């Protein structure tokens, strides 16, 4: 994060099934053990202190993750429309316009390979005013 006008936070959650069949999202930390086949939810929180046009968000994926929805296209969620581009190592979001406020995006992927990985970071930037940019932290993940 540079000046605070624009911020992005990335949190990863693993979906666990509790007794009784209820599903719960548990935050992923460096000590969380994942298994091949686990469903992981990436939650991206965007904060803007002013309205911005042509905002780009790139969410990098760890090499052990495969997106559950592999089709790119225009989406509508939480009152905002955006284009999603699914790539090999990242998911890109393109917003024509964002008003001041907080926005939360979520999408899911599956764990495909075992090993130790860096989950990747999220980077957000205003396309025609690149001085407005920020990035999130990343977390290490271990897959059995």
Could you describe each region identified by the protein language model?
Residues 1-144:
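C-terminal segments of large proteins
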């Amino acid at each position: 994060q540079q000046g605070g006008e624009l911020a992005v936070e990335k949190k990863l959650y693993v979906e666990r099934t509790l007794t009784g069949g209820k599903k719960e999202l548990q935050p992923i930390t460096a000590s969380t053990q994942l298994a091949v086949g686990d469903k992981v939810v990436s939650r991206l929180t965007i904060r803007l202190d002013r309205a911005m046009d042509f905002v780009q968000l790139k969410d990098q994926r760890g090499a052990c993750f495969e997106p559950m929805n592999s089709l790119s296209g225009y989406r509508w969620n939480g009152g905002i429309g955006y284009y999603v581009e699914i790539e090999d190592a990242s998911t890109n979001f393109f917003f024509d316009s964002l008003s001041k406020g907080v926005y939360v995006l979520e999408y899911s992927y599956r764990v495909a390979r075992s090993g130790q990985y860096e989950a990747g970071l999220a980077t957000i930037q205003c396309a025609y005013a690149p001085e407005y940019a920020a990035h999130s932290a990343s977390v290490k993940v271990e897959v059995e």
